[in-house]
């Protein structure tokens, strides 16, 4: 494998040229280092706000930014980084990351521990002719079927009908989602925002991400994105309370206690719809978000459900001649025929015995009858002589 990229070590990570021929360009402020790893992947909060539209709803912009995480099968973080688009060559970050012989291809080829790729993008991936992001992602996953991909985005890119490529992008998203469970597509919302802020954004005061994570406008936009991606991919999203599922063990308990005291926390399902009349700065900490299935969860079977246990026995293998020998009697005749003949002989002997007994009984009865008749005749003769 001859890599297309060049990587340089820095004090807090690495910087990568996705294509070795890139050079400093006046048309692109990020050239030539569009991929950054480690702590080099952090961006200022102002840039994050303008790119991802957080904490307010998104608005049209041309910059593409993708954060990524590479994790092992147990969920341990192997590498984190970011990729930015190139305005000079009109290349999207997903196209750079999933390029054949590109940066991710080389990493996974040399490190078999990487099993999960998680992307956090401000735009959903597209498949337009100048970028082919989804096509490259699809081919990448075909080469690494043991690797899963989870894509989270803050807004859909060119899927509305007013864009000429909308139908093509929707069909490409549907095809990528068909690789489920290897691939999941979800809107960023709830606790995922908090995770991104803590991992990839710099210049945030302590406790801001937990106490003031959402606004009503951001909440409605996240729900709309989840609904739209569900309609496009026809894959039903699953929701959970992300603030609890994403809570880290070393999180400051006082910060979480402050968030739990908010009036909108732990609301009932009937109260999930936010009140638009409230202050836009009110944190919507009750937001339900798609659950990220990394690291994979192995659910044990229910103890109440019976399990079918199949035991395989090794039977004795006999040759055909031995099988025939076992089936025959010592006299060399088939067992079934010999038993049938013995049974018929016994029945004939029993019949002969019964016949002889019946004949003897018949003769005895006949002799008794004859004696009785003779006696009766003698009695009749005596009576007739007396009457004369």
UniProtKB/Swiss-Prot annotation:
The keyword Transcription regulation does not apply. Its cofactor is Zn(2+). Signal peptide: none annotated. Keywords: Hydrolase, Metal-binding, mRNA processing, Zinc. Putative C to U editing enzyme whose physiological substrate is not yet known. The active site is at residue 94. Residues 60-176 form the CMP/dCMP-type deaminase domain. It comes from Rattus norvegicus. Belongs to the cytidine and deoxycytidylate deaminase family. It comes from the Eukaryota. This is Putative C->U-editing enzyme APOBEC-4. Its EC number is 3.5.4.-. Zn(2+) binds at residues 92, 126, 133. Coiled coil: none annotated. Pfam families: NAD1 (PF18778). GO terms for molecular function: hydrolase activity; metal ion binding. Residues 322-356 are annotated as: Disordered. PROSITE patterns: CYT_DCMP_DEAMINASES_2 (PS51747).
């Amino acid at each position: 494998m001859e890599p297309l990229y060049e990587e340089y070590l820095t004090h807090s990570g690495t910087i990568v040229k996705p294509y070795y021929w890139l050079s400093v360009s006046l048309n692109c402020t990020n050239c030539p280092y569009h991929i950054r790893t480690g702590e080099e992947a952090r961006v200022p909060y102002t840039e994050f706000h303008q790119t991802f539209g957080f904490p307010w709803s998104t608005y049209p912009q041309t910059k593409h930014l993708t954060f990524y995480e590479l994790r092992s099968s147990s969920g341990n973080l192997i590498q984190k980084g970011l990729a930015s688009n190139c305005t000079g060559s009109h290349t999207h970050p997903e196209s750079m990351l999933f390029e054949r012989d590109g940066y991710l291809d080389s990493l996974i080829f040399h490190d078999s521990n990487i099993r999960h790729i998680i992307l956090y993008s401000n735009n959903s991936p597209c498949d337009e002719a100048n970028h082919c992001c989804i096509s490259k992602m699809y081919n990448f996953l075909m080469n690494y079927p043991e690797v899963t991909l989870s894509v989270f985005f803050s807004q859909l890119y060119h899927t509305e009908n007013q864009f000429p490529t909308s139908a093509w992008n929707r069909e490409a998203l549907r095809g990528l989602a068909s690789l489920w469970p290897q691939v999941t597509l979800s809107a960023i919302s709830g606790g995922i925002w908090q995770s991104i802020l803590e991992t990839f954004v710099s210049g945030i005061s302590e406790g801001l991400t937990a106490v003031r994570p959402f606004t009503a406008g951001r909440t409605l936009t996240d729900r709309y994105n989840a609904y739209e991606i569900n309609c496009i991919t026809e894959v039903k999203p699953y929701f959970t309370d992300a603030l609890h599922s994403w809570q880290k063990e070393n999180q400051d308990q006082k910060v979480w206690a402050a968030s739990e005291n908010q009036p909108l926390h732990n609301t009932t399902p009937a109260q999930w719809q936010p009140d638009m009349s409230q202050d836009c700065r009110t944190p919507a900490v009750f937001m339900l978000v798609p659950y990220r299935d990394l690291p994979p969860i192995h659910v044990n079977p229910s103890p109440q459900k019976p399990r079918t246990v199949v035991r395989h026995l090794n039977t004795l293998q006999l040759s055909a001649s031995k099988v025939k020998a076992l089936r025959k009697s010592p006299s060399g005749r088939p067992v079934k025929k010999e038993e049938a003949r013995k049974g018929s002989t016994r029945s004939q002997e029993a019949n002969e015995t019964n016949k002889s007994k019946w004949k003897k009984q018949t003769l005895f009865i006949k002799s008794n009858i004859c004696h009785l008749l003779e006696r009766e005749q003698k009695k009749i003769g005596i009576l007739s002589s007396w009457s004369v």
